Each structure stands twice: as C-alpha cells, then as structure tokens.
Amino acid sequence: MTAKTKETIGVGTRSVPLSNPDKELFPDDGITKAELADYYRTVARPMLPHLKDRPLVMERYPDGFQGKSFFHKDVPDYFPEWIRTVQVPKEGGSVTMAVCDDAATLVYLANQACITPHPWLSRADCLDCPDRLVFDLDPSEHDGDGFETVRWSARQLGDLLTELGLRPAVMTTGSRGLHLLVLLDRRTDFDTARHFARRVADVLAARHSDRLTTEPRKNKRRGRLYLDTQRNAYAQTSVAPYAVRARPHAPVATPLEWNELDDPGLGPRQWTLRTLPERLEKDGDPWKGLSRCRRSLTAAEQRLDAL
C-alpha cells in the first residue's frame, strides 16, 4: 500500500493543505482532487458572491463521484479556525455549518472531496429571510425532444417573471435541467417567498397545461416538464453557480446569457470543469451585474394578483 501524499496550494495569503492530490475523483477523465481544487481556485471570483455569508451543505465523494457520497452539514472538529462557521438553529439545538467567504475556503472544501457546494437561499445574519428564489425546470425522463422543452420553458417563465417586474437569471444545472434565479431584497420570509413561487409556477402551468406541470409525483406528470419550486424553504439549498456536479466528465452549473437559450445545441451539461475556465476567460461572467437586480416581492405579488 502506498503512503498518502500531501502538498499545499497557495490561495491568496494562505497555504491550503491538499491531501492525496492525485486521487482520481472522475476516473474516466483522470480528473484528480488537485484538479478540482485548482478549478475552484480559478472560478472563485465569480462564484464567491453566490456563497458568501451563507450556510453551506457539502456534497462529498471521498472515493470519487461514482463511490459512496453524503451531504455534510455540520463542520468537523478538524476544520481550521480560519474557516468561518455559523450556528444554525434546529429542533432541539443547533448545527455548526461552514460559510464559504473566500477562495481558500473553497479550495479547502475541494480537499474534503466536496465536489458540489450547496448554499442556503438566505444569509447568516437573517436566516429566515431569503434573498433569492429558485425555479428548477426538471424535464421529463421520457422527453424525446432533447433540451428544446427546457429552453422553451425557461423563456416562458423568464417572460412571466419579467412581466411581474422581476429580473430573472438563468443557468444550466450541470445535471438535467435549468435553474431560474430571482434576487430578492430580503424583506419577506420563506413562507411568503415559497407561496409566491408556487403561484407563479401554477399560472404558467395553467397557461401551458399540455407541456408544463407543478405535480411533484412523477407518475402524475404525463411527460410534462416539472416546474419545481420546493427549494424555496427554510434550510433548503440550491446548487451554487459554477459548481461541479458529480456526473461523468465533471459538468458545471453554468450561468447563461438569455440569448444562449436560442442555441438548439444547448444542453444541461454543456460545460465542464475543463472547459468552463476558457468560457469565463473569453466571455466573462454573464451574471457579473446580477447584484443590482434585487427586487421586492410586494409589487410582484400585486401584479400577479391582477393576472
């Protein structure tokens, strides 16, 4: 048995430990833990605004993406003191969760074989008040038209949200579908936000009942795309933009420009750990100005009532 190797990777002013760097997390592609860590160091600038100040759930794969995995909420005792943590209340006590405020933390999580970080939809200083809504466009497993229905659905939902005075953004999930994201001003609670999201989805599904549904039970969807709004609840998470997914070839959840939905070749796993950095270098971050798009739900609710 060979001894495990250790090295360090420089991230800002910190030297982050990297154990067993040659461990292959995606064996078919030869993608190692060191390559995962380097990827997250590379994309930290556009990714961190979507992680900062948020409790984080770590999706870990110690034996590679095809091996046993687990969602890790509580911070282990061995985590270094420089990683920020937050006490999150739960029934009967609390849980200590990591907060990824800097690139060094992001790289350290990669060393823990955290392939995919999942942040909360609210921030640590006001856990009950979401600052984003997420709509998950989940295609039918029997959808035979490729990704066309998902692209069409994103357009329809984006138009409706814009009609309500909101500023939605769209990204591939790196898995099966697309996410639409709406930034909020934190003046509402989760119950209100979730109810609003479900009403929006219901309106759109009623307009296109032959293609869309809000039915969570798969056997009731009859081949229609599922408009999933269930992530919009306290303690729920959503995959972070630019996060790697535990799927073949290490696809990445990728923010898009809206006009990219016009590309018939677009797919949910279009970009990977190895191709995304080149996209960023060439085209920049499509969501660079997203923080200026925060909106209140109050006016949007009034417009929705009037439909």
Where are these regions (language model features)?
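Polyanion/phosphate-binding surface patch
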Residues: 53-86
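Signature for HUH/AEP ssDNA processing cores
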Residues: 96-176, 184-192, 305
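Short beta-strand
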Residues: 59-61, 168-174, 215-219
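C-terminal accessory nucleic-acid interaction domains of nucleic acid-metabolism proteins
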Residues: 1-31, 35-38, 48, 52, ...
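Class II aminoacyl-tRNA synthetase-like tRNA-binding/catalytic domains
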Residues: 78-104
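A short beta-strand motif that forms the metal-chelation/ATP-contact edge
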Residues: 179-185, 225-229
